[in-house]
From Swiss-Prot:
The lineage of its organism: Bacteria, Pseudomonadati, Pseudomonadota, Gammaproteobacteria, Enterobacterales. Forms a complex with GatZ. It is an enzyme of class 4 (lyase). This is D-tagatose-1,6-bisphosphate aldolase subunit GatY. Gene3D superfamilies: Aldolase class I. It comes from Klebsiella oxytoca. Its cofactor is Zn(2+). HAMAP family: TagBP_aldolase_GatY (MF_01294).
Amino acid sequence: MFIISSKNMLLKAQRLGYAVPAFNIHNLETMQVVVETAAELRSPLILAGTPGTYSYAGTGNVVAIARDLAKIWDLPLAVHLDHHEDLADITRKVQAGIRSVMIDGSHSPFEENVALVKSVVELSHRYDASVEAELGRLGGVEDDLGVDAKDALYTNPEQGREFVARTGIDSLAVVIGTAHGLYAAEPKLGFAALPPISERVDVPLVLHGASKLPDSDIRRAISLGVCKVNVATELKIAFSDALKHYFEENPDANEPRHYMKPAKAAMKDVVRKVIHVCGCEGQL
């Protein structure tokens, strides 16, 4: 097996009415757990990393580990650039073997966003890499960068149609009230915004900020056209909480192979639950 584009993966999800989970990876253990669980459940999978993740782990290391895991588990993997903004950085990573890109120009005016995204599409498609872009502005914190809720903007359906047509993107990240990070109160998603977008846009839709959303909200979003669901913070919390608990019980512990076991088990529970909610088990 090998590293693939996420394009056909998402088109199949769109056709059959489920969603592909994109789990943000942070270290070797995250990658091991996510891939192993997806393989056991025969689920399609996207491994996503922010610029901070690739800086921490090294793009070459991420690609090499993903290729090895794909071979071990006989699982095609999409390794994805999440919320990247710089064309030169994206170019280097695509040339290193990445085949799925999210270019985020959502903080820019519409015309600037279109121009940036179009340039990334032209570059990425030469390498058979798929491109996702965001229209609207998501609240919350990602990679230590924050957007206040008051500054978040929903995706405009008519602009969405124009954006997809002019840029040639393969999937569209929509903003309907989700946010990066965990929610201080139960979010109220704008589900009514999804049908007008789906009617005007023929590419798969992406939902960011799905950590700790009620399962019913995720399922409803999928029923209205969402084909990719991003989960990041929920994995980090499970991992870190399990580590904290282990050291509370074993304050003198110093063997990573021991204390990583409960941390990986906690993440595995999250991955299994998300795959079930997305309805993608057995869809390889």
